[in-house]
C-alpha cells in the first residue's frame, strides 16, 4: 500500500508527523491530493484541550479545512474525475434524523465528520462526496477556496443573527472568523465596530472588513464605554458578536448591547465552562442570546 506523510492527533498537545498508509477510496469515495490546508481556532483549541465532537477516537487525522485536486475516484462516482479542483466541508448531515427533519442540519445526530487535512492526501467519504464536495471555479486559488468551510460557518451565523441594514454591530475578537463576521455584517448594510488586540488584525479590520470603527482593547479598561460612544445616544449596540471563546468575554458582551439588543456567542468555550449572567438585564431589557454551533 502506498504511503504518505501526515500529522496525526494522539492527545491534547500531542501531535506527530508520521508516515501512514494512503486510504484507498471506496466505491463512492474520492481521494484528494491536498493543495492547501488552513488552521482555524477550532484546530488550535483541539490541539490544546481536545474536542468533544471532531475527535471521536485517537490516533486521528488532524485538520479539517482544505482544498485540493482529485487523485482517484471510486467505481460509482460520476460527478468527479481525476484532475478536478475541489473543496469540501468537513461534515455532512444524514438528512433523516430528528434534527435533519427540522432542517437543523448542523445538529444532526449522525453527522459524518472528516479530519485529516494536514496530510498529502485525504479520502472524502460517500456522504460528504454527495452533499459537500464542490468543484472550485476557474481563477479561484486553492488557498482562497479552502476558506469555503469557515466562511459557510460565518454565513450561517450572520443569517441566524438577523442583522439588518442600519444596525450597529460590534465584533469582539478579530481572528479570521471575526474578520469574516465583520465583513459580512458590513455587506449586510450594518455599521460595524471591530475590537481586538493584535495590531495586524486591527489593520485587517479596516483594510479587509471595512469596519467603520476599530477598537484596540489593550488601550481601554472599560471597552463597553467606547462601544456605546459609537451608538445613538450611547444606548448600546444592536448586535454584539463574540468570536473569542472565553467565558470572561462572554460575560462582558451583555454590557455592550441596548435594550432589545442581541448577543451572539459564536466562539466556543471549553466543555463544562459556566458563566455568570445578569438576569435582570436579560429579562427586563429583553436582551436576546444567540449561540450557533457552526
Region locations from a protein language model:
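Glycine-rich beta-strand-centered segment in the early N-terminal region that forms part
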Residues: 23-37, 51-98, 135-139
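Conserved beta-strand positions in the Rossmann-like core of class I SAM-dependent methyltransferases
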Residues: 71, 193, 264
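NAD(P)H dinucleotide-binding glycine-rich loop of Rossmann-like/cofactor-binding domains
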Residues: 94-172
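Adenosine-nucleotide cofactor-binding segment
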Residues: 138, 171, 186-252, 272
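Hydrophobic/small residue at the entry helix of a nucleotide-binding pocket
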Residues: 153, 177, 201
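Glycine-rich adenosine-cofactor-binding loop
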Residues: 167-185
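Glycine-rich phosphate-binding loop and adjacent beta-alpha segment
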Residues: 247-294
Amino acid at each position: 500500500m502506498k504511503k504518505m506523510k501526515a500529522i496525526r492527533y494522539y492527545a491534547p498537545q500531542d501531535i506527530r508527523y508520521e508516515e501512514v498508509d494512503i486510504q484507498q477510496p471506496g466505491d463512492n469515495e474520492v481521494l484528494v491530493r491536498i493543495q492547501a490546508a488552513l488552521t482555524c481556532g477550532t484546530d488550535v483549541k483541539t490541539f490544546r484541550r481536545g474536542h468533544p465532537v471532531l475527535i471521536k477516537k485517537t490516533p486521528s487525522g488532524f485538520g479539517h479545512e482544505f482544498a485540493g485536486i482529485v487523485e482517484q475516484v471510486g467505481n460509482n462516482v460520476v460527478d468527479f474525475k481525476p484532475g478536478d479542483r475541489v473543496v469540501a466541508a468537513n461534515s455532512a448531515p444524514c438528512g433523516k434524523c430528528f434534527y435533519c427533519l427540522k432542517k437543523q442540519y448542523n445538529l444532526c445526530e449522525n453527522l459524518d465528520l472528516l479530519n485529516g487535512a494536514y496530510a498529502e492526501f485525504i479520502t472524502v467519504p460517500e456522504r460528504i462526496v454527495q452533499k459537500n464536495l464542490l468543484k472550485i471555479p476557474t481563477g479561484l486559488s486553492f488557498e482562497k477556496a479552502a476558506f469555503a468551510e469557515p466562511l459557510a460557518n460565518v454565513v450561517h451565523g450572520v443569517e441566524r443573527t438577523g442583522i439588518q441594514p442600519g444596525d450597529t454591530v460590534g465584533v469582539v475578537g478579530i481572528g479570521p472568523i471575526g474578520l469574516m463576521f465583520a465583513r459580512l455584517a458590513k455587506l449586510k448594510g450594518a455599521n460595524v465596530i471591530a475590537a481586538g488586540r493584535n495590531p495586524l488584525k486591527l489593520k485587517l479590520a479596516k483594510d479587509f472588513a471595512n469596519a467603520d470603527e476599530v477598537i484596540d482593547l489593550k488601550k481601554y479598561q472599560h471597552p463597553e464605554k467606547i462601544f456605546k460612544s459609537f451608538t445613538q445616544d450611547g444606548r448600546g449596540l444592536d448586535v454584539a458578536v463574540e468570536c473569542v471563546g472565553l467565558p470572561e468575554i462572554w460575560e462582558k458582551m451583555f454590557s455592550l448591547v441596548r435594550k432589545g439588543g442581541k448577543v451572539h456567542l459564536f466562539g466556543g468555550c471549553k466543555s463544562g465552562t459556566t458563566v455568570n449572567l445578569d438576569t435582570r438585564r436579560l429579562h427586563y431589557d429583553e436582551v436576546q442570546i444567540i449561540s450557533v454551533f457552526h
